[in-house]
Amino acid sequence: IGEAAFSDCNSLESIAIPDSVTNISNHTFVSCSNLTSITIPGSVTDIGNCAFYECTNLTSITIPDSVTSIGNLAFYKCENLKDVTIPESVTDIGEYAFYGTKWLSEYPDDFVVLKNGILIAYKGKESIISIPDSVTSICNRAFAKCNSLTSVTIPDLVTSIGNSAFESCSNLTSVTIPDSVTSISYGAFQGCDNLTSVTI
């Protein structure tokens, strides 16, 4: 489905995507404010940037096992989205993909971690934290602007730290990065003005 194909279709309430579709492109359903139901088939492998941005009446989404990538802001400001199923096949989640959703705001733990070990976000206010041992990857912007954070220890299973993962954590002074980490992405610690101790 091409970019912005159904954007601003405010009367669209439901859609069933056929099995012939392999990709939901950027901005495909942006601001479809009355969309309440969508069926994504097992043929889809990628959900693009802003694909469902501000679909404010969407309440649930089941992402099939075929999907490996969810783009930046894919479900951003889907304010009534409460039930989300993300399979272990998803290995790449873009910046703020689920921000502004009930699913994220009502998530029962401070660390939002998928079954496959991807840490999407941190919602807590603690100053000293140890990331859970189950985490294998830290998502883009997972800790961005966590101004309460002063010290963080990253566990031994983590292999990658995403773009801007700790950007503008203005009070962060120390971070411990294990040998398992093979990739620290663009801007991971950008704007951490008080960072004085990094153990790698």
Feature-to-residue mapping (PLM):
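Consensus positions within tandem repeat domains that build extended binding/scaffold surfaces
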Residues: 2-7, 25-30, 48-53, 71-76, ...
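Structural signature of tandem-repeat unit edges
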Residues: 9-23, 33-46, 56-69, 78-92, ...
